């Protein structure tokens, strides 16, 4: 039999050293079998050949897959990605979220840096020629190159970022595709072209070519190339920023962590648009000035248009033009705001030419002036612009008005949304307070009740700021709720002496079931004789506890409750009693708040559950602690001590009276007839003392009538 058993071989008992591809082959093609494991009669040689066949077959399938170009499609859950050997990033990983935020910032910086290339052309006021600011060209090219490095890093990161398989989005987050080939294919089909066009260093190439050639004829070509290239590259850059921001919101849940950050973000975008508009206005002003100079040069006859660009002073005929250029250009291309009939209508660019910023070498002054012009006209939708009949100028003005309208609406709408989120709770409180006032007025509540309602609403607002803490905590997982409750309540619960010596498991169960309560001044928490439905543990404030022993005449007991004490101890006795029914115990005291009180409440159902689940509450130590801090037990103990003390005083006085009577009788010893008189005097004195203390004895008996509180069923140590 043993030999026959050795001939049985299971498929799943094959060598565990098989590669993962063969295991995947077995799993993928398991449906080809009948679904049940049958014994296979084979020898050891047959089993070894079977192993080799599976290995070769799986390798063959993999090679066929590579030759067909399909790749190996693999998907894992996010938690499995952490133990993967491949460096593939989870799209919701904190590091990747930080990199995406950094990339958004780099995109915004690139959009901010690119308009600096529009400030490169500048007019030389002395030579009356158009040149390029070399220092600014080097600075702008360096900044653009540095920012493009972030683009390249982001492109490399996209090739290592997993994505969620569309077919696995039925439930939960879905499975992550970690196959590098699939990730690269998806990126190449979606965003690679846009990223590639955005990162091309075309402005740097144009600037570096000009800096190396330094020919005057290259100024015009450089100016036109920069205008065209920056405009063209703005399209893919904007197309990349907006989806990336949306993806960041979808992945992280929010784009800005605080409302002020969100408002500042949209304000920054509005200022960025003003910066772009100002740079365009500066460059287009130079274009109009260049067009005027070319017309004046052609009309002069002794001028070549190459003379208008710096670096061409060595050309033939420049000396003749140099003598006449001042008068020709000033008469033909004069820009004056006060001139109602100018020789050349510069339109909206007159302000730039008359202010002299196109010829200023101070970049800070030039930039601030253009930024202010862009911000002013975006905010006013270009209402103060007086355009000429030049088509490009009119198109620029129309674009400015439309862009200003859209951006201003976005700015106001988003800033209002973000800033309203700061005061939404306050507004809700105002609405609730208004509704409460209208309701109290409609129901004609007395003034004292209205004041109590207002005081409670105000105190609750100051404590919670309108946030429903219980609702927030209830939506969290159980272990997270336990940790939060432990963090919030454990230190306060340990201040209650009844819970100070309990173990952590019992304290966690109590903290999970505690509910915060607020009571304003002069609020009655419970009245004597009412059912006790919750046990309160005081955290802050002062309370007054009064009892009349069920309304008995002549009996009044008053005590103060402070931080760390509790009330409603009748409920604990009821919860610990296994024979207690569904009827709640009656309160033996009236508890009133003397100040604003914060407390934790433990309801009857929750206390009964804790008492039934945790035997620690039945220990002798808890019994002694409960008796020591219970005001009901303290009242009983005080009455018991008073009754014992009065009995002691009575007995002592009677003994003193008898001693005095005996002394009198011994001092008056004489004839025999005086013995009977002394006996009668002693008897009369005893009767007198007995009569004097009769009323006092009645009071003592009434005091002792206060019943001892029922003891709970402490069945375990």
Curated annotation (Swiss-Prot):
Predominant subcellular localization, coarse grouping: membrane
Pfam family, any one: Ion_trans
Lineage of origin: Eukaryota, Viridiplantae, Streptophyta, Embryophyta, Tracheophyta
Sequence intervals crossing the membrane: 103-123, 137-157, 191-211, 225-245, 266-286, 392-412
InterPro entries attached to this UniProt entry: cNMP-bd_dom, cNMP-bd_dom_sf, Ion_trans_dom, RmlC-like_jellyroll
Compartment(s): Cell membrane
Protein family: Belongs to the cyclic nucleotide-gated cation channel (TC 1.A.1.5) family.
GO MF terms held by the record: calcium channel activity; calmodulin binding; cAMP binding; cGMP binding; intracellularly cGMP-activated cation channel activity
Membrane topology of the entry: Multi-pass membrane protein
Protein name listed in UniProt: Probable cyclic nucleotide-gated ion channel 5
UniProt signal peptide: none
Domain IQ: 634-663
UniProt KW keywords: Calmodulin-binding, cAMP, cAMP-binding, Cell membrane, cGMP, cGMP-binding, Ion channel, Ion transport, Ligand-gated ion channel, Membrane, Nucleotide-binding, Transmembrane, Transmembrane helix, Transport
